[in-house]
Design a protein with these regions (language model features):
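Conserved nucleic-acid-binding Ia/Ib motif block in the N-terminal RecA-like helicase ATPase lobe
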Residues: 1-9, 15-43
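Inter-lobe coupling linker of SF2 helicases/translocases
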Residues: 8-10, 34-81, 86-130, 161-194, ...
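Conserved helicase ATPase core of P-loop NTP-dependent helicases/translocases
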Residues: 33, 37, 412-415, 419, ...
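SF2 helicase motor core recognition
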Residues: 52, 56-63, 125, 139-140, ...
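Conserved RecA-like ASCE P-loop NTPase motor core of nucleic-acid helicases/translocases
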Residues: 364-372
Length: 510
């Protein structure tokens, strides 16, 4: 059971109380314990092994299977190159495919050069006969090759963890007749249509082979369509025509094929006791400094498009990143700029305080999501080897080390403003402070009991597995969530019926 959630919570939720369950810990996968723990799985009589995603990825698939998978990918690209050349396709497309092929060949050579490690227990040796993957959308970046060019919406990123999962799914299909893998997710398609094809490759690979759709372009020609439309430019000024792979075609046939492996349940069908939600879209007017900075972003983008600036010096990724920071707070770009009233952060603080005061009798709690300007880790202090020397120790105490001023962060700014308005510091917490499973468990317990009333965190750290909804009444999005799975942490089942609020400060056109 690879899970992205807190593993102890997953064990408690297991439906069979008398089952013999093994739950992994971080210590189990430390370098000197990993082999022993894998042997324990292989030789033990367990009904289920609950394991974290990162730990699951550290159990290797056999070298022979990795080599076979890489050779299949190389052959697929070789066939694609031959097709493009035979049809008189663009030379640029051929070069792209050849670069990808060389990269895969280098990976294959490296794998072969590593040699065999006889002491490593592989996934095949564990004796696993079923694989249940929670939050399976974390494995959406599977290798994908296409002859399409200049088409947005095609996710071709190859993550090692996804390739590893694909190899393990193929193995499970072999030993179970394609009935050994179960994926669970609330967002099978988060930000790219290619993700549906990816799920089918994980769960329906043999079926795709029967239909001659193991190559993405064959699948896309039957079920996808490219659309050209005007879009707002990344720098936030003006529009541009953009072709995207963004529309499904032959949707009934696609859904019939997908439903061969998918059990789809919508919120209406489940009818769970979720709270009634009141949404607020808060608009913050840009300051004069922000308006001037947006003009500067536009000028930088024009130079990038014209090719007059070196990509290592400036590029659209940097410009977009600066635009996101600027959209949240101008002090992230320059801490010396003034803290002006009416900004996103100040409006958010006012909302938090009002809801905090209104919820005093019931100790109602709030979540604040912010993925930019997160808390910085305290600088590590170097300790001298001769620290136990009494003279040195006395000198160190007599001459205090000057403290470096902390860099500006939105998190700390919000905390200080809440404290200044009368909120006890003990009722405010950052998810980043809970850097171990034990601390995270304690923090969540405090939020559920109302001891911590405001919890700030990023989507990555406070997303999946954060079940603190007992007294939760409001959620604030300071920056715009990028994916559907990032939205709705407050929309969970409750033991008590109540109304909740979702405040979105996140829409930025820079």
């Amino acid at each position: 059971y690879p899970s992205a959630n807190i593993l102890v919570t997953t064990k408690k939720d297991f439906d069979y109380p008398s089952a013999n369950i093994l739950v992994t810990t971080k210590k189990d996968f430390e370098s000197h314990n990993r082999k022993k723990f894998c042997a324990r799985i292989a030789t033990g009589d367990y009904d289920a092994v609950i394991i974290g995603h990162s730990q699951f990825e550290r159990i290797p698939i056999s070298r022979e299977r990795q080599e076979r998978l890489l050779r299949e990918q190389i052959n697929e690209i070789t066939d694609g190159i031959a097709e493009v050349e035979a049809s008189g396709g663009e030379r640029f497309t051929v070069k792209q495919l050849e670069r990808t092929k060389k990269s895969l060949e280098a990976r294959l050579e490296k794998l072969q050069a590593e040699g065999r490690k006889d002491d490593v227990i592989t996934f095949e040796q564990l004796g696993v006969d079923r694989l249940f993957v929670d939050e399976s959308h974390n494995y959406k970046n599977l290798f994908l090759y296409t002859k399409m060019r200049n088409v947005a919406g095609l996710s071709t990123t190859d993550a090692q963890k996804s390739s590893d999962m694909f190899a393990k799914c193929r193995y499970m299909d072999e030993i179970t007749g394609s009935r050994g893998v179960v994926f669970a997710t609330g967002t099978p398609v988060s930000n790219s249509m290619t993700e549906l094809y990816t799920i089918q490759r994980y769960l329906q690979y043999e079926r795709l082979q029967e239909l001659n759709m193991t190559h993405f372009d064959c699948w896309a020609s039957r079920f996808g369509e490219t659309v050209t439309a005007l879009e707002l430019a990344p720098e936030g000024t003006g529009y541009r025509a953009r072709t995207r792979f963004s529309k499904f075609f032959n949707l009934p046939e696609l859904m019939n094929l997908f439903k061969e492996v998918a059990d789809i349940k919508t919120a209406d069908q489940l009818d769970l006791p979720t709270p009634e939600v009141e949404y607020h879209n808060i608009v913050a007017k840009p300051t004069e400094h922000q308006q001037d900075m947006v003009k500067a972003l536009s000028e930088r983008a024009a130079k990038v498009h014209s090719g007059t600036v070196d990509p290592s010096t400036d590029n659209m990724l940097k410009i977009t990143s600066d635009g996101r920071k600027l959209g949240l707070d101008q002090r992230i770009i320059n801490p010396m700029l003034p803290d002006e009233p009416g900004t996103k952060v100040n409006q958010c603080v006012d909302n938090i305080l009002q809801i905090w005061r209104d919820g005093q009798p019931e100790k109602l709690t709030q979540l604040v999501f912010c993925d930019i300007s997160t808390p910085q880790a305290a600088g590590s202090k170097k300790v001298a080897k001769t620290l136990d020397n009494p003279i040195l120790h006395a000198l160190e105490q007599a001459v205090p080390e000057p403290e470096k001023p902390l860099a500006f962060t939105v998190y700390e700014d919000i905390r200080q403003k809440l404290i200044a308005q009368g909120m006890p510091a003990s009722q405010i917490a950052f998810i980043h402070e809970a850097n171990t499973e034990v601390r995270k468990k304690e923090l969540f317990s405090k939020v559920r009991s109302g001891q911590v009333r405001v919890l700030l965190g990023s989507t990555q750290k406070m997303g999946a597995g954060t079940n603190v909804q007992d007294l939760l009444v409001a959620l604030h999005d300071l920056d715009c969530p990028w994916r559907p799975g990032d939205v709705g942490r407050i929309l969970r089942t409750f033991k008590i019926k109540k109304n909740v609020e979702v405040t979105d400060n996140g829409k930025d056109d820079f």
